[in-house]
């Protein structure tokens, strides 16, 4: 948003320089990205009056002009502009003057004729061609009103000004208008803001006699109003208005269109002006477009509409694409006499979808997308009527034709001085706090210690108590908040917390296992929001997402990790091993904050060990991924168990839940072949753990045991079992019959194929025995081994 200092002074008076004002605004939360000085690099630029023009004797395209620049005698200037003529007031750069780009004006001879100065175009004094009126695109600028020769040309053009460029965050849509900015500045300087004139001299003829308004869907169009102005004269707008539009980055067109744009910038309320006689009926019907319906917009482009688009119609034919662009046949032309002014509130989501789909971004659509201040809708239309009466000789009909409800102008929020003081860390009196709210233009009501703040609709960023607290701190001045030393119950300076220490240990374990840490977006598409979720709970969706791919808060880290793996594989990095520790989000009831839970997730695909001279490659499989998870459990001194599970998105026969103290804390498995193929991945294994749950159980140390004094003993066993029997069931049986000498087990081979019956698999398991009190004997181990084998046979296994 470009804010002209000259224009701003119309609403609020301050003594600070523009640079000081810009610094103060930046310190309170709105970043001033640039300060544009239209007088920079310009010297000796005055108004001139062309007294005579004669053809150059030796050049067909040059003219010799005698120009009055307020001195004793006219000066002779040779000019090649096609539109120069006697009787014009023009911009003259005097000898010794300077123009943007380092151009210095000197006396010269052009084809033998003396030239003492330069008659300038707007481009030559630094105005972008994008914003120059079309009538002056290819020639010098000619003043439409009489001027005094010799006066400062920049003053005459209303360009002796400095303009602040705001870099606004989406929540501060109120600063997308001059009045919204004036409220902000008035609050910063504790001064009054003067609003512009909106009252017109109205005819006795009522607009209700000439027009009706109907809204078919008030969910999409809560309010629509129109006023009528007759007998307007289409001509250039005043110089001061053109200058303000140019400084705001808008090209002047004519007085009627310029007034529409001027009020848009002034109030932040988009308006649209129709040629009343071209509408084709006395009714305006606001509805959603019919599927396949077409209309031609002001840019002479035929648009095919969808049912999600909102259109303004004459009862049958669309005459405007609501909130985005008008239609061609109802636009204001030079012959236009009667005007219908539209002021409305449209659904922000619908406007955003339409403008994005059609690639029609405009000053109007950008404001509708962020939400309109209901308090300004009718006032902005009245302001346009006043300006049309003043600068287009219009006759304003009385009454407003409207449909729907404007909605609330204010939002009441209760707060106390104690709440504010506890949050900002120092004491302000209730009176000081109320004064700050009044500076912002917020009315207040006081009931004992409760302050009810009536927040106007223009401040859509203020919805809760904490927003009010921020406003108090901003306007009081962050720089003026007294410095205090923090008070800690327990000082941990230079020391990791227990949580930080454990998290660092886990990261080191995973990095040691060959995984790289990833950090991905918390926002996912609505389709991915519940993918792999361990809790069946409602998602948290954004009201106005920047894109469909980032519309909801995630309930799992895996969707983006899968996307990251696919991205790497597509770029020839086929061996991908990633992990992430991040937050997932689950909605609670209305008005309640969501739950934020920290998860640990990982993804592995390709080769775990690349084929090198040291040894053969090792491809990622289920047991390798499980080994990574087991390393985490060992480091945190936890004992995981595994249970077969069916989880959407994972292979039905290679998936397990991870249990801790008989509670599910995660899962591990192979990505479903279909999902893997959709992402151009080969066999891929993933795991996800509720990291908060692990941290709640984990102790901050590892229980160490002395190195055994007696040797252990290992036995291998090969089992042929039904392919649907999980290895975890077999291991559970083994440990149940292993007594106190079976210390651990390891699945080291799984085979299916030749030499085995269909539907069977072979599993090889290593059993490690140890007695810490005495040396094991073969007889003792064989006895336990026999009991284990008997139990396995009873379970249906065949000992190979």
Curated annotation (Swiss-Prot):
Pfam families: B3_4, B5, FDX-ACB, tRNA_bind, tRNA_synthFbeta. Its cofactor is Mg(2+). Residues 39-154 form the tRNA-binding domain. Residues 408-483 form the B5 domain. Keywords: Aminoacyl-tRNA synthetase, ATP-binding, Cytoplasm, Ligase, Magnesium, Metal-binding, Nucleotide-binding, Protein biosynthesis, RNA-binding, tRNA-binding. It comes from the Bacteria. Mg(2+) binds at residues 461, 467, 470-471. It is found in: Cytoplasm. Gene3D superfamilies: 3.30.56.10, Bira Bifunctional Protein, Domain 2 (3.30.930.10), Ferrodoxin-fold anticodon-binding domain (3.30.70.380), Nucleic acid-binding proteins (2.40.50.140), Phenylalanyl-trna Synthetase, Chain B, domain 3 (3.50.40.10). Its EC number is 6.1.1.20. Residues 708-800 form the FDX-ACB domain. InterPro entries: aa-tRNA-synth_II/BPL/LPL, B3/B4_tRNA-bd, DNA-bd_dom_put_sf, Fdx_antiC-bd, Fdx_antiC-bd_sf, NA-bd_OB-fold, Phe-tRNA-ligase_IIc_bsu, Phe-tRNA-ligase_IIc_bsu_bact. Binds 2 magnesium ions per tetramer. GO terms for cellular component: phenylalanine-tRNA ligase complex. It catalyses: tRNA(Phe) + L-phenylalanine + ATP = L-phenylalanyl-tRNA(Phe) + AMP + diphosphate + H(+). Belongs to the phenylalanyl-tRNA synthetase beta subunit family. Type 1 subfamily. PANTHER family: PHENYLALANINE--TRNA LIGASE BETA SUBUNIT, PHENYLALANYL-TRNA SYNTHETASE BETA CHAIN AND LEUCINE-RICH REPEAT-CONTAINING PROTEIN 47. Tetramer of two alpha and two beta subunits. This is Phenylalanine--tRNA ligase beta subunit. It comes from Staphylococcus aureus (strain Mu50 / ATCC 700699). The lineage of its organism: Bacteria, Bacillati, Bacillota, Bacilli, Bacillales.
